[in-house]
Amino acid sequence: MLDLYRRTVARFPLGSVSYMFAYGSGVKQQEGYGKVGNGNNLRPPPGTVVDLVFCVRDARGFHAENLHRHPDHYSALRHLGPNFVAKYQERLGAGVYCNTLVPLPDVGITIKYGVVSQEELLEDLLDWRHLYLAGRLHKPVTNLVNPSDNPPLKAALERNLVSALQVALLLLPEKFTAYGLFHTIAGLSYKGDFRMIFGENKQKVHNIVSPQINDFFALYQPSLGQLSDYVAVNMKGQEPGSRKPAIIFEQDKSSSATCQHLRQLPRELQKRLQRNAACRGDYTQVVNHLSMASQLPEVLQASVNDIVWRSSVTQSIKNIPSAGILKSLAYSYRKAQKTFAV
């Protein structure tokens, strides 16, 4: 593990941590930010925050030990004790407890970290109940505690990527570029996010995808292999409207292929499709109708947006007490600045 991450992670109680990852502009290169260092020179760009997520088997135990070690990381909610903090984490919003804008002077960075129970993360990855952390994990991240020795979690992470790819295929035309594919995937968890109205750079998805095409390829190679009967690299061409070289994919857009993708969608997305489709009936009937409907991409995108909108609103409201008013205002100001970034 790189020294910066090692020194950062070592201060936290890791006994119940089954998975941990870092993400965001402080970790992965994004357009519009300074260069992220690599190797032994790893250093977040100036002004960025390193985002961390701890997946824990025992939320109460983690918070009890973390409160003992780092009471200053928590807002006034710390005075209510670890039982309350764990329940607040698990019962509200998207099931994540966030400590925001935590300075680590000894390593010279600022972090934001979320804590989620393994059970909650598994449900989000498999069912897209919130499409919150599942959406974060549609994009390249840096694993700090690897889930390789946790078969259920490893399988759920893989299934989440296949689901994202299947949704993207349903949204895309018969032929599309690699950039178009990964832009569609990365946008799934942003298009319905209310923070995109005023709290994020409107070019965020492009800024994530453009410098990370190779990382996206590496992340989705196994999923593309699983769906090789339905999608394949067809040729090398050009990005639409430019002379830039591009890898072109071609997919099977037959009704049988569409039905296959629709049948395998995450459970929460299936529920949303049933509500939003013009056809009324059980999910099998909805699938048969949508597989031949020209409105499928619009209905599917609206259904994804429904999930993301709800979780982004409830989790953002939940984060205000967990961060504290001053930190919430400071964090919101940082985010609002991105809205007006050129």
From Swiss-Prot:
InterPro entries: Tam41. It is found in: Mitochondrion inner membrane. Magnesium. Also active with cobalt or copper. GO terms for cellular component: mitochondrial inner membrane; mitochondrion. Pathway: Phospholipid metabolism; CDP-diacylglycerol biosynthesis; CDP-diacylglycerol from sn-glycerol 3-phosphate: step 3/3. The keyword Membrane applies. It is an enzyme of class 2 (transferase). The keyword Nucleotidyltransferase applies. Its cofactor is Mg(2+); Co(2+); Cu(2+). It is a peripheral membrane protein. Pfam families: Tam41_Mmp37. It catalyses: a 1,2-diacyl-sn-glycero-3-phosphate + CTP + H(+) = a CDP-1,2-diacyl-sn-glycerol + diphosphate. Its EC number is 2.7.7.41. It comes from the Eukaryota. GO terms for biological process: cardiolipin biosynthetic process; CDP-diacylglycerol biosynthetic process. GO terms for molecular function: phosphatidate cytidylyltransferase activity. Its main location: mitochondrion. Keywords: Lipid biosynthesis, Lipid metabolism, Magnesium, Membrane, Mitochondrion, Mitochondrion inner membrane, Nucleotidyltransferase, Phospholipid biosynthesis, Phospholipid metabolism, Transferase. Catalyzes the formation of CDP-diacylglycerol (CDP-DAG) from phosphatidic acid (PA) in the mitochondrial inner membrane. Required for the biosynthesis of the dimeric phospholipid cardiolipin, which stabilizes supercomplexes of the mitochondrial respiratory chain in the mitochondrial inner membrane. Belongs to the TAM41 family. This is Phosphatidate cytidylyltransferase, mitochondrial. It comes from Drosophila melanogaster (Fruit fly).
